[in-house]
Amino acid sequence: MDHTVKSKTADTVSSPCAVVGVFERRRLSPAAKAVDEASGGAITAALKRGDIEAKPGQTRLLTDLDNVKAARVLLVGLGVERDLDERTYRKAVTAAAQAAQDCGAGEATFYLPEVEVKTRDLAWRVQQLAIGVTGALYRFDDMKSEAETPRKPLKKLALGVADKAEAKVADEALAQGMAVGRGMSLARDLGNLPGNVCTPSYLADQAKALGKRFDKLKVQSLDRKDMKKLGMGALLAVAQGSQEEPRLIAMEWNGGKKDEQPYVLVGKGITFDTGGISLKPGAAMDEMKFDMCGAASVFGTLQAVAEMNLPINVVGVVPASDNMPDGKATRPGDIIQTLSGQTVEVLNTDAEGRLVLCDALTWSERFKPKEIVDIATLTGACIIALGHHRSAVLGNHPPLVKALQDAGETSGDKCWELPLDPEYDEQLKSNFADMANIGGRPAGTITAASFLARFTKRYQWAHLDIAGTAWLTGEQKGATGRPVPLLTRYLMDRAGA
């Protein structure tokens, strides 16, 4: 989607559709007031008639208003003015985007960021507009023979700024928000693809394609032979039941100084998870194509970082594999040696994510990271603990955990810290190996992170469990693109952007 900034008032802007906010109790935003005065009170009249009550997310389309250059004016309800908060603002943006597309304008000029949102500045409001519009209009029709396209899709987003002094800030924020939105779309695309298309090799090809787009992005991909030579026994143990070749993918964004330590993101890339010999129930197993959403978020974040040209060094690492039952598959009770040299008794082959991650986390030490964050759809226990609204965050470095929490609050892609006390680590004891790969039913999210913590003692590390936030079920079934907003905001903060 193209985007631009227009330094025009809502009544003078030449646009197929101008989008303005209205509040309950017939209060108008500055843009709505300008249109109302120019048109002889058309908006006030609509409010008096009850055409729109201005409750959050309500919309009403007005056309051919006198003395207004825009062909259409879309009114968007913002609720009570003094109560306008982040959640209400995002709801209004989503509704506005959908209504702007449905009206067939093809292009819309949004004035919503001019309104005051509690504790948030103009840049935040513009970024959230761009992210919200991109997300609201996202469609995944790639696998359909006949795509259900709108009669006239919204192809251009314009941001209306009445105050020219704010145009520069708005322009930069709009570009940043669009980059995050496109990163989320990439993550959603990868997540929504079926397992017979989005294989480990497919992900490696997508990484190479990203590398060709951006000069500062270096890409490498290790195959089974490379992993065997290195001694990645855990990743290979997961992969050995599948005919699909595993891959370990690294994408290095060199936007900072050559000697600056990079921030490393490690994303779980199980492209389809049957559970292996510890086979999952058949119901809803199709959703296990989403088990690579951690990897997808790394792709989306790296693309956003590259589009924004952030002055920071970032490495994205993706251990990619299927987890399949086969005559060669790992059995419950097998003992494997990880890249770190530690041994693991595999009591449950459906706890495979931590196995591919532990080798990737050890391998990532070669980058001499400043901080490492791993992202994984790791445990169903996380859904029980936090539902589908917040991801879980755990780690060995409180300032890093706090930075991720802050990034989540700012972006709206929120996370919640769970403890990582040493007592939980005792649940991983094995009589036959250094550790077991499961710790029983109690505190499943925490014991999974405790397992990973054994491989991250040499650097500052945090773990994001996105099992409850990476995809939706039901009528809106599909990947969400989370936690791309959180990760991108975290890296922007680290880069001072």
Curated annotation (Swiss-Prot):
Where is this gene product found?
Answer: Cytoplasm
Task: Give the cofactor binding note.
Answer: Binds 2 manganese ions per subunit.
The enzyme's E.C. designation: 3.4.11.1, 3.4.11.10
Annotated Mn(2+) 2 binding lies at: K268, D273, D291, E352
Which InterPro entries would you find in this protein's record?
Answer: Leucine_aapep/pepB (IPR011356), Macro_dom-like (IPR043472), Peptidase_M17_C (IPR000819), Peptidase_M17_leu_NH2_pept (IPR023042), Peptidase_M17_N (IPR008283)
Xref: Pfam families: Peptidase_M17, Peptidase_M17_N
Q: Which GO terms describe its biological process?
A: proteolysis
The enzyme class is: hydrolase
Named cofactor requirement(s): Mn(2+)
* Name this protein carries in UniProt: Probable cytosol aminopeptidase
Q: What gene is this protein translated from?
A: pepA
